[in-house]
């Protein structure tokens, strides 16, 4: 496990194993484990002290635009890659699983199957918000893992794919944030 995510990863493995144990021990129970990639969307936390990357960047760029800031710092060099899926797409997947429960694999990753660099996310969010300033890499800040991307081969075989584009997801999230 990657050190900064070890506790989270172990908790997911433990929960999946518990579901597997219960399902195998008693035929009246049938559990499925869905492991999503990183999520963002409406009702997210936008407080920079306890938010995930996309809502934090939305707030950061929104504030920079309002304040007329010409520069925004990006932690690290911005080349690390992350996979973020709009939360509404996960809700859709869960609904599909309920409708096709017997076909749903016991354990399945849910994601886009593609990732973007941190720089790409900043540019996409700036475009939605209408921010025209520049981004500066703060190389004194940590980069984290170079890539976080889930394997979606089983998801593809199941016949499901996300519907929300990055631009639409960011726009939906930003519109919610402005309310």
Language-model-detected regions and their locations in the chain:
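C-terminal substrate-binding subdomain of Rossmann-fold SDR/epimerase-dehydratase oxidoreductases
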Residues: 63-179
């Amino acid at each position: 496990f990657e050190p900064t995510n070890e506790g989270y990863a172990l908790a997911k493995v433990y929960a999946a194993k518990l579901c597997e144990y219960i399902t195998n021990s008693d035929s009246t129970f049938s559990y499925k484990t869905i492991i999503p990639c990183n999520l963002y969307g409406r009702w997210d936390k936008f407080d920079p002290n306890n938010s995930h990357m996309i809502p934090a960047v939305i707030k950061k760029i929104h504030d920079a635009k309002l304040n007329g800031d010409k520069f925004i710092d990006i932690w690290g060099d911005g080349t690390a890659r992350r996979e973020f899926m709009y939360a509404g797409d996960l809700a859709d997947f869960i609904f599909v699983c309920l409708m096709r429960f017997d076909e749903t694999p016991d354990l399945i990753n849910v994601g886009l199957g593609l990732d973007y660099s941190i720089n790409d996310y900043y540019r996409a969010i700036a475009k939605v918000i209408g921010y025209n300033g520049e981004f500066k890499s703060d190389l004194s800040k940590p980069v984290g893992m170079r890539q976080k991307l889930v394997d979606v081969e089983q998801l593809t075989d199941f016949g499901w794919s996300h519907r929300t584009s990055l631009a639409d997801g960011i726009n939906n999230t930003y519109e919610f944030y402005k309310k």
